Each structure stands twice: as C-alpha cells, then as structure tokens.
Amino acid sequence: LIESRSRFALVRRDDGRPDVVFYPVLESSPLERYDEAQQKQLLDGKAIIADVGTADGRHSKAFVQIDEGTKQVMYVPTPIIGRNLQVLAEIMHLGPVEVNGMQNGEPLTLVVDDEPVTVGIDLHDKTGIRFCSGDSQKWKEQPKREWDKYTFGVYGCWVMDDDGNLDYVPEEEYTEELWNEQKKSAERNRAAGLHK
C-alpha cells in the first residue's frame, strides 16, 4: 500500500465520459526549463508568461504558476487568460502599464467605492483572475481555496488539518466529535433555510 498526498480533478474526456486526474505532491517543483529570473518569480508564488511545450511537440506561450500544495507547475495558454484580462481592462479602464504589471505576476490594487480592491492573475481561480477586498499584501495572503474544517457529504466528511490538507472520513469511521459537528452543520443549514 502506497500512501501519498495528491490533488485530484474530475475532467471530461473527448468522448464525453468523466475521468479523474491525480496531481501527486512533489518534493520540489520542476523548474529547470525556466531561466533564473523566472524561477525566482515562480518560487515567489507569481504567475508568469513563459514558453511551454505541448503534447504534440510544439511550443507556445502560457501563464505558468506553481501550485503550492503539490509543487506541480500549472499552465494555461495565454489567449485564455488574455481574453479575461482584456475584458477586465475594458471594465476597469486599465491601461497597458497596469495590464503588463499583472501579466508579469504583480497584483494591481484599485480603489472601488472608496475601498481598496486587488486583482491579479492566479491559475487556481477558474477565470485565471482573482479579486480580493484589500491591498496587495492581503491578496497574497488570502487562501486560494476556502474550506471549512468539516465539509459533509452524503456518506462521509472531508476534514481539513492544520496544514490545509483534506482527508476523507466515511460515516462508519466518524468520531463523536464528527457526529456533533454534523449535527451543528445541519442546524446551521436549517436555520439558514428559514431566513431566506
């Protein structure tokens, strides 16, 4: 039996059927294809534009970022996030300097309704662009995924440890603490339903 931390994603195959993709936790990120400046930016948690090789042997430009949880290198082709950046630039009236800064991994802080709002490229977000109420420091500190300590499903519960890792516990293995948390969660959900 081999146990290893990993992330997984459900994807749809070309034939329309679902499949599971696993991303194991690596000891370190494979950064040898990036120059020293790019490696520094990636290790600082920034999304950068770099050349990537495709499955068919071609090269293209993509936004690249390290997934801190697995140390895997993620990438998204530049046109996908580029379109989202273009829409953002039009809505927020951003100039080329602001857009270029974001393309180089720097979050941008704006004032909206007298409050600071920070936006930047983050490949963890489904649009590739993440917003945060607050300054750039808060944007950098904000967790990429927000989960409760306990996330209950139909037959079990995902439990988050102090390091942000999730472990699945089937109902048969619930402790008294988990049963109590499930009752509290049900009460909160019931109360929220009454106030709608």
Identify the meaning behind each predicted range.
Residues 1, 43-51:
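Short, hydrophobic/aromatic-rich segments at coil-to-beta transitions
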Residues 1-12, 181, 188:
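N-terminal intrinsically disordered, low-complexity leader regions
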Residues 5-7, 16-37, 72-76:
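Beta-strand-dominated lipid-handling architectures at cellular/organellar boundaries
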Residues 6-8, 46-48, 62-64, 119:
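One face of beta-strands
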Residues 10-14, 66-68:
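Short, low-complexity Ser/Thr-rich regulatory SLiMs
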Residues 10-11, 38-41, 51-56, 98-100:
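Tandem-repeat/low-complexity and Cys-motif detector
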Residues 22-25, 54-196:
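A eukaryote-biased signal for long
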Residues 31-32, 41, 66, 81:
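Intrinsic-disorder-associated interaction segments
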